[in-house]
């Protein structure tokens, strides 16, 4: 059996839903049909992708690997279909936006959309890959993050604008974890926990490893994407670093890390300053809107966490031009 796009959609639906029953309902198929399809996919790939339990399904290590590759492929396929249909219909002008994961995306795209201009979105866990696509003319702008201590490779001909010089990274842990009872968590409180990181995100593993090593921790580490990490946190299997704008859920808690030991720089990249000027205000508004919707991040901001930055161009890693803007 050859793997097809519909098979990848089924796998992602199972992972997101947490059970075959819920995934089948979302896909509009019978559960036995989905179960049979999953078995055939597993046979084609050479091993089990999910463990079946009474409470639902969880990805196996092989499943996490497959899901980590499947999600960006599905995003690319959806973008291809959408852009092809628009081109066939003589559609509106397109603004090609690239981004690493961010809760600001929905608000940003909503603000950019207007008569005669329809933004398209291409997601990628690799900030360096997105920057290369801007340079190559495949994207108009890209919103990326740079893990401190892990400089991005910024092409010479790009211009960048800094949205936030240092966004602190928080931790997502099970809601019933003893440390979740406090608003600020020390890394020592998580010494016995397994951590999950996504090694495909530029700089994430190095940044997390350096943060843990600085306080003498050498925990067990699992590799997987953000969606898998969130589901495993909910079941009490792991803890993970997360963006401060992440929302707590009934089964998970988002908390600040004591001393803010890990941060990222948020950058917008384009080939010209005019392109930056055209989209940056909408991104800025969307980011702070998302930031204040998170209780933990809002409290951190109200405590004076973000520094005021002067506007001034400086040389970026690799020679691109970076502009700082005043934080709100």
UniProtKB/Swiss-Prot annotation:
The keyword Transcription regulation applies. InterPro entries: LysR_subst-bd (IPR005119), Tscrpt_reg_HTH_LysR (IPR000847), WH-like_DNA-bd_sf (IPR036388), WH_DNA-bd_sf (IPR036390). It comes from the Bacteria. Residues 1-60 form the HTH lysR-type domain. The keyword Zinc-finger does not apply. Residues 20-39 bind DNA. GO terms for molecular function: DNA binding; DNA-binding transcription factor activity. This is Small neutral protease regulatory protein. It comes from Streptomyces coelicolor (strain ATCC BAA-471 / A3(2) / M145).
